[in-house]
Each structure stands twice: as C-alpha cells, then as structure tokens.
C-alpha cells in the first residue's frame, strides 16, 4: 500500500488478511494514518506493516488513561459501575450509572476526569469462528470540536474488549 492507495486499500487488507471489519469512518482514519507513514517513509507499506500500525495506533492503547478494575451491578436505574482507573500515575475509583455496561464505564470516566465527548460508534465481532475466539470491539467518540477519535479493543471477553476500545479512543483524543 502506498500513499496513493487510500483508505479503501488499507481497509480491504485489514479485512481480508487479518479479519478486521472496521467501521467506515475508522477505516478512513486508518487510511490517513497509513498514508502519513507511507509519505514519511517514502515507501509502500506491506500488509504486516499496516496491521502493526493499526495495533500501535488503535488497539488497546493504555496511556495516559487506563482501567485497573471494573464492577457492575444491575439496578432499577440501569447498570451501576464502580471503575478504578489511572491517569498519569494517579489512581481513583468512581461510580456511575449507564444504560449498559459500556455507557456506565464511559460515564464513570467522564465524571472522574471531567472528559467531554459523546459515544458515537460501537461495533464488535469475533476474530475467529470458535467458542474460544477473541472478540474485537471498535469505539468512536466525538470530541467537542466535532472530530472523531477511535479505539479498538481485543479480548476474549467482549465487555473487556469494549472497555479497552473506549479507553483507547479516549487516549487518542
């Protein structure tokens, strides 16, 4: 893939070679990331380099925010969560409520760190066809300026994959 191939070529390679079915706008963001690297290096990117760039840029990026522990409880209000998270080495625990687990964690992080964003895109799928397969979740958050930040999370537990995707999107703001 070179700088002329665009987002379609990058998305096609990630889907056909690695089984990643990125949301359309995330595919576009990945295409721009690949183009930037291709332009900077003055060379075509091979499929493995594209996959490595995806993992480095969008998958399970755990800094400066990270999640240490999460607990959920079903209540009359929805899902209540207690999230222990770390930002730049400082660990805090926050409780929040949401209409689902991901929404509850998102609300806890917003409350803990006064973050401003809206959860806009969520997509998930299995990476293999077996009961022991890992899942991948994709999350897109809209920043106050209207631009999107993206994250992906990979884990055998889809809830953990979703939380990791959210944290990566926050870290990519």
What are these regions (language model features)?
Residues 1-173:
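Terminal or standalone catalytic/regulatory effector modules within metabolic enzymes
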């Amino acid at each position: 893939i070179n700088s002329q191939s665009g987002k379609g070529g990058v998305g096609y390679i990630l889907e056909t070679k690695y089984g990643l079915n990125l949301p359309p706008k995330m595919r576009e963001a990945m295409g721009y990331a690949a183009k930037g690297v291709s332009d900077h290096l003055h060379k075509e990117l091979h499929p493995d380099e594209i996959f490595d760039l995806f993992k480095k840029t969008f998958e399970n990026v755990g800094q400066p925010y990270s999640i240490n522990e999460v607990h959920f409880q079903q209540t009359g209000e929805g899902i209540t969560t207690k999230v222990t998270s770390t930002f730049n080495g400082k660990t805090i625990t926050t409780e929040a409520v949401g209409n689902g687990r991901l929404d509850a964690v998102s609300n806890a992080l917003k409350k803990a760190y006064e973050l401003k964003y809206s959860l806009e895109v969520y997509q998930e799928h299995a990476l293999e066809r077996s009961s022991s397969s890992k899942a991948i979740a994709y999350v897109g958050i809209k920043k106050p300026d209207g631009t999107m930040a993206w994250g992906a999370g990979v884990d055998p537990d889809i809830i953990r994959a979703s939380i990791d995707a959210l944290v990566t999107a926050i870290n990519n703001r």
